[in-house]
Amino acid sequence: MYILQESLFSFEELQKLESKERLPIFFSALDLRPYAKELRSRSPRGADGHCRQGILRALLAAPLENISTFTGLHRRLDMDLRFRYQCGLRLDREAPSVATLSRVFADLTSKDLAKRLFEDLVTRCKQEGIIDGCHVAIDSAAIHAYEKKQPKRKSELTGNANWGAKFDSFGNKIKWFGYKLHLAVDTKSELPMALEVTPAHVHDGDLAPNLMEQVAVRTKVEFFVLDAGYDQLKNYETARNLKAQAIIPMNLRNEKEPPAGMMSNGTPCCSMGFPMTYWGAVGDILKFRCPHATGKVDCPLGMAACSSSNYGMVVKVDTTSDLRRYSTPHRDSKRWKELYHERTSVERCNARLKTFLTADAMHVWGIRKVTTHQYLNAIVLLASALAMAGHSSKAAA
C-alpha cells in the first residue's frame, strides 16, 4: 500500500521559474540583517568591504541556482549583473572575490550563524502553519566528501570524512567516502526541522535520540517514523520520554524468540496458536480478541473452549512492558502502516537537497564547514516554503 502525500508547498514550482523571477520571490522571505551584522568586521581599519548581507544572500542563492563552488559563485556575480543586483551587491565595484566569499563562509561556520538562521526559519514555518510537526520522519543520506580519501583507521581519528556503507532501496550495498546527513522532517510539509552531520561510519540509530530531542523543543510530536535501521531500544525510550510513539519496523536479524504465546510483532496467540485480532487501544493498553469471534479464523474448538462469553476471549497487553515489541497503534495494524508510509517524506526531502540543490556537491572540507553547507541547503527549502506561501497569499488577495 502506497499513500501519495501532498506537500504544502511546491519547491518544484519555484524551480520552474526563471532566475530573474525566482530570486526576488525567494529573498522576500528572508531578513538577513541580524545575521549579516555579526559578519561585519569590528576593526575601524582598512577599506570598506562588500555588503555582508549581499554576500550572505549570494551564498544562499548559490544552492538554488545550482552553484556549488566559490569560484562558480564569483564568476556568476561577475558576469551576471542582474544576479549581483538581486543579491544586494553594488554594481559600481568588482564582485566579491573567491577569497572574500570563502572568508564569509568561514565566519558563518565559526559563529554557527547558519544553524541559528535555520532554527529561526523552522520556528517561523511553525508559527505560520507551514510546518505541522505532529508527525516527524527521521533518516540519513550519504554525502560524498571533497577530501582526499584515507584508510578507514586513519580517517576515524580525524573526526572528518570516513568510509561508510548502507543498503539502498533495492538491497544493493553502497560504499562511499564522506559524511552522513541525518534529517528530521515534518511529514506534512516535507520540510527539515533538525539536522546533524557525522562521518559516514556513524550508525544511524546513534543520532536519532538527539534529533528527536531537538524537534521536541519546538513542537509537540505524536509520532516519530523511522526505518528498521533505527530499531534500538534507546530510540523507543527517547520517544516515550518525549510523550511520543516511535513507529519503527522490527529488525528480525539476530532476533531472539518472542515470549511464549506471542508473535514477534507483539500479537498474542490464542490457545490454538492463531494470532488474535487487534481491537484497539486505551492509553498504554492494547486489546486483542478471539480470532474466531471476530471471523478471522474458523477454530475447530469454537469460542466455548476459551470463554463462555459470546464476545470471546480478550487479552490485554501493556505496551510499557516492552517498548520495542509493543506499539500504540499496534504493529502491522492499518493505522500503523499508514503512519509508517509517511516516512517517504524524509526520502523526498533528501532527494530535493541532493538532486535540485547542492547538498551532495560539496567543495568544502572538514565536518564543521560541511555542516554549514548542509544548513545553507536546508535553509533554501525553508525560505522557499515561506516565500511561496507569501507569494500565493498575495496572488489570492
Where are these regions (language model features)?
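Charged, often Cys/His-bearing segments associated with DNA-binding zinc-finger transcription factors
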Residues: 1-37, 300, 307, 323, ...
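Basic, short loop/linker segments at the boundary and entry of helix-turn-helix/winged-helix-like folds
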Residues: 20-61, 65, 100
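Generic structural signal for hydrophobic core residues of well-folded globular domains
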Residues: 30, 59-65, 108, 343, ...
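Short, positively charged, Gly/Tyr-enriched micro-motifs
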Residues: 48-116, 363, 368
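Polybasic low-complexity intrinsically disordered regions
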Residues: 75, 98-241, 245-256
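Helix-centered, glycine/charged polyanion-binding patches within enzymatic domains
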Residues: 237-351
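Basic, amphipathic alpha-helical segments enriched in Lys/Arg and hydrophobic/aromatic residues
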Residues: 328, 334-397
